[in-house]
Amino acid sequence: MSEQASRSDGRVFLVVVDESPEMRNALRYACRRAKRTGGRVAMLYVMDPPEAQQWGAVVDLMRQEARQQAEEVIARYADVAVSLTGQPPAIHIREGKSRDELAKLITEDRSISVLVLASASSSEGPGPLVTAFAGKLGNQLRVPLTIVPGALSEAEIDAIS
């Protein structure tokens, strides 16, 4: 596909936002690819559901606090996306299990073109989402999966994106 054709497609690069160090690599890569191809970045933050409690008020308070934290985290990284792409990202905040909510979002939002994840640079493995979607759940994706090595420097990411 030519560069011009990809620009008209409005490619959307989805990044799952969390507090892991490698997530920054996925975000940087997605932003640079979006800018170079005339696309956009979308960000997904998945809140853990509150554990079952007897009192609904406690669950409601836990949800409010989790939502506030999600909004703060995603706002911080949305600012990074704006600085790298010049445009605000699409923002999705959901509650549930990360891999389930990620799969649902990709199914529901037909504008998403590429899923960008970063592998953890620790010896514990690449991370749960990379493990899931590069493995058994990969056949459920309707979009390509790009895995950015978590150990890359910003300069190395810039060179490949």
Residue ranges and their predicted role:
Residues A26, Q53-G56, A103-K104, G127-P128, ...:
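Short, well-ordered secondary-structure micro-motifs
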Residues R11, I112-V114, R142:
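Conserved acidic residues
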Residues T37, T85, F133, Q140-R142:
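Short, structured coil segments at secondary-structure junctions
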Residues V116-Q140, L152-I157:
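Glycine-rich, Arg-bearing micro-motifs that act as flexible, cationic patches
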Residues A42-L44, A90-R94, T146-V148:
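General small-molecule cofactor/ligand-binding pocket signal
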